[in-house]
Amino acid sequence: MAYVTIDDSEHLEKALKRFKRQVEKEGIIREWKKKEFYEKPSTVLNRKNKALRRKLMKKTRRSRDSKSY
């Protein structure tokens, strides 16, 4: 959980910026957006498989390009 301690001499805007940065770093908003709507288990599986195939294709392309002839 993200939290920020504020000093008496610190401006509120600066503390809000620090809080926003910390929330983005922890991925809280991204996780919330993922869980905002229900997603069927089959859809989740299809999305993960698609990402895995994309990752493998990228890896094979890189290995093919890096070969020296």
From Swiss-Prot:
Pfam assignment, any one: Ribosomal_S21
PROSITE patterns tied to this protein: RIBOSOMAL_S21
Keyword flag Ribonucleoprotein: yes
Presence of the UniProt keyword Ribosomal protein in the record: yes
BP terms from Gene Ontology: translation
Cystine pairings recorded for this chain: none
UniProt superkingdom: Bacteria
Coiled coil stretches, renumbered: none
One example GO MF annotation: structural constituent of ribosome
Matches recorded under Gene3D superfamilies: Ribosomal protein S8 (1.20.5.1150)
GO cellular component: ribonucleoprotein complex; ribosome
Keywords: Ribonucleoprotein, Ribosomal protein
Family label: Belongs to the bacterial ribosomal protein bS21 family.
Name by which UniProt lists this protein: Small ribosomal subunit protein bS21
Lineage of the species this protein comes from: Bacteria, Pseudomonadati, Spirochaetota, Spirochaetia, Spirochaetales
